[in-house]
Amino acid sequence: MTSWQVKHFVGRTQYVVVPFDGQRVLRATSNDSATIITKPIRIDLEETPYLNWSWRVEDQLSGINETTKSGDDFAARIYLVIGDNLLNPATKAINYVWSSNQPRYSRWSNPFAGEKVQMIAVRGATDTISQWRKEKRNVYQDLINVFGDKGSEHKNRKAYRYLDAIAIMTDSDNSGRAATAYYGDIFFSTK
């Protein structure tokens, strides 16, 4: 965790590496808080387009509208960023979330950042909590799908080839609730 940068927005979500189900995982506990942990990376999506991870959510944040600022809370989310700074208009991000109320595979713009940060509900309101889930996403294809096909493979590669950062966030500051999530191994692969 020493290579991760921590940014507290509201309160302090606690991130701790713990043993769980025979593996070492990251436990995130939010109590009316929002803290993001970020790691600069340089991932070539031409070589390794697939993001693989496992996660487990212990709490649903039911009754909130996650597509609004007042409901933008998630027990678990993983950001992938193209660009050096989310304040830069050219920077784009995908935010894979475990949604408490949106259908699985739905997509919407982040209510704070707008169109440059796209939310994708990898898990939705009907998914069972308190169970490990393994995920695999073709990040390169997701970037094309959410930010648009540039018209040719060459232009798509130029726009979407490299990732510059990954971030993890468990937050419940807007709803004032509590949430706990666990994150297993996160890695990129060719298939």
Regions found by a protein language model. Name each.
Residues 1-11:
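Short, tryptophan-glycine- and acidic/Ser/Thr-enriched carbohydrate-recognition patches
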Residues 40-51, 126-129, 159:
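Extracellular/lumenal carbohydrate-interaction signature centered on repeated Trp-anchored short motifs
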Residues 13-36:
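Short carbohydrate-recognition loop motifs
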